[in-house]
């Protein structure tokens, strides 16, 4: 009957709402704080075109909306551009999750590998837990000081009575 030793380590989980830089997250350009020798350790879960996601999510609703319009000036030709230029909505949102800091959870340590596993598990269930946040870009970075996860998503709602019946919304 072997005894098990239980070790309890306290760490903070930080969740930040970011501006979102898909090009940085997918490493289309490399920031100064990136260690290029560790980039191969990153996990790119998905990296879809946001415009393609908009077509998939909203084209049917856009057609229904436009078909009902009697005035040509009320029709929307490009829903993505309409939202991109809107003052009320953003085309997408980003959250960044990190456990601990560069001292307690360095990417190059055992604790960093633990953070990687925890963040990976968190991502694996994210879309199922959040069906109205359509993830189009998600990346786990192991090439910076601390492992962290970027999740970029388009929030949407269905069943709206005004405007498009399926539309961008973080509020609903």
Sequence positions of predicted segments:
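N-terminal nicking endonuclease/strand-transfer module with a His-rich metal-binding environment
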Residues: 1-172
